[in-house]
C-alpha cells in the first residue's frame, strides 16, 4: 500500500546493485505516477516516457498521422534519449499523465517499454505504483524477483496478499518475498506473515533516512550501517541476488 517506504527501498536496492556489481548495466525505472524515485536516487529528470506518448497522441489528434507514425517508429531511439545516465546506472521515468483519470494508457505503453529494454540491461529495478493496478494490467508480465513491501499493519499485509494473488494468476515470476519496513515494535513481527511468501527482512524505522529525506539527500548519502541499507542488503541476500 502507499506510504510503506516502497520507493525508498527501491532506491536502496539500486544502490546495493551499483556497489556490488560495478560494470554491470543497471536500469532503474520509475513506474509510479507519484514520481519519487528520481529524488531518492538524486537524479534530475527532464523528459519522461509519457512525453513521447503525448507527442504521438497530440499529432494524431491534429490529423498528422504520418508524423505520428514516424514518432512511433522512432520510439526506441527516443526512449534511449529519455534515459538519464548516472554513475553506475541508467534511469528512466515513466512520468505522470497530464490528463486526469485513467492511467491505463501509460501502463500499456510502459509494458512495451519494459519488454523492449529488458534485454539491454543486466539488472532492471522497477518501482511500481502501490496496489495491484500494474499487476492486473500485466505491465510487468515476467519478472525474476517480485518484492512486496508492507509495514506492520494488517492493511499493508492484506494489500500484499492481493498483489500476490493477482501475480499468481497474471504474471510469471521466479522468486517472491516480502520486506516488512518501518518496524516500530519488533515483538509484533511474528504477526506479520503471508502464506507462501518468505519475509526477506524486517527493517526498523530509520531516523537517519528520515533526516536525509527532510534535507533532500539521496540514498547514496546514507551511511552503510543505516537501518534501510542493512535491511535491503539482507533482503537481497535472502533473495539469492548476493
Regions found by a protein language model. Name each.
Residues 213-226:
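C-terminal boundary of histidine-terminating zinc-finger modules
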Residues 6:
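Conserved lysine of the Walker
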Residues 2-3:
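Walker A (P-loop) phosphate-binding loop of P-loop NTPases
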Residues 9:
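Hydrophobic positions on the alpha1 helix immediately C-terminal to the Walker A/P-loop
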Residues 18-86:
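N-terminal phosphate/diphosphate-binding loop that engages ATP/GTP or pyrophosphate donors
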Residues 70-86, 90-126:
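Cytosolic-facing regulatory segments adjacent to core modules
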Residues 12, 16, 40, 138:
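Active-site signature of alpha/beta-hydrolase-fold catalytic machinery across serine-
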Residues 105-205, 211:
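Conserved catalytic-core segment of NTP-binding enzymes
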Amino acid at each position: 500500500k502507499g506510504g510503506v517506504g516502497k520507493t525508498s527501498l527501491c532506491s536502496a536496492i539500486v544502490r546495493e546493485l551499483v556497489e556490488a556489481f560495478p560494470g554491470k548495466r543497471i536500469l532503474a525505472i520509475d513506474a509510479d505516477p507519484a514520481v519519487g524515485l528520481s529524488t531518492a536516487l538524486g537524479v534530475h529528470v527532464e523528459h519522461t516516457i509519457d512525453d513521447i506518448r503525448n507527442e504521438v497522441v497530440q499529432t494524431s489528434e491534429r490529423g498528422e498521422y504520418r508524423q505520428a507514425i514516424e514518432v512511433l517508429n522512432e520510439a526506441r531511439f527516443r526512449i534511449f534519449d529519455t534515459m538519464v545516465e548516472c554513475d553506475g546506472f541508467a534511469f528512466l521515468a515513466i512520468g505522470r499523465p497530464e490528463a486526469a483519470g485513467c492511467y491505463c494508457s501509460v501502463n500499456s505503453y510502459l509494458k512495451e517499454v519494459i519488454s523492449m529494454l529488458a534485454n539491454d540491461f543486466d539488472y532492471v529495478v522497477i518501482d511500481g505504483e502501490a496496489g495491484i493496478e500494474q499487476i492486473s494490467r500485466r505491465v510487468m508480465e515476467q519478472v525474476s524477483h517480485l518484492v512486496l513491501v508492507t509495514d506492520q499493519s494488517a492493511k499493508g499485509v492484506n494489500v500484499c496478499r492481493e498483489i500476490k494473488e493477482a501475480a499468481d494468476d497474471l504474471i510469471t515470476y521466479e522468486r517472491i518475498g516480502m520486506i516488512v519496513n518501518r518496524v516500530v515494535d519488533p515483538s509484533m513481527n511474528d504477526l506479520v506473515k503471508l502464506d507462501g511468501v518468505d519475509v526477506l527482512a524486517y527493517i526498523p524505522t530509520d531516523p537517519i533516512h528520515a533526516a536525509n529525506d527532510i534535507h533532500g539527500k539521496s540514498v547514496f548519502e546514507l551511511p552503510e550501517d543505516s537501518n534501510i541499507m542493512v535491511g535491503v542488503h539482507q533482503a537481497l541476500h535472502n533473495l539469492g541476488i548476493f
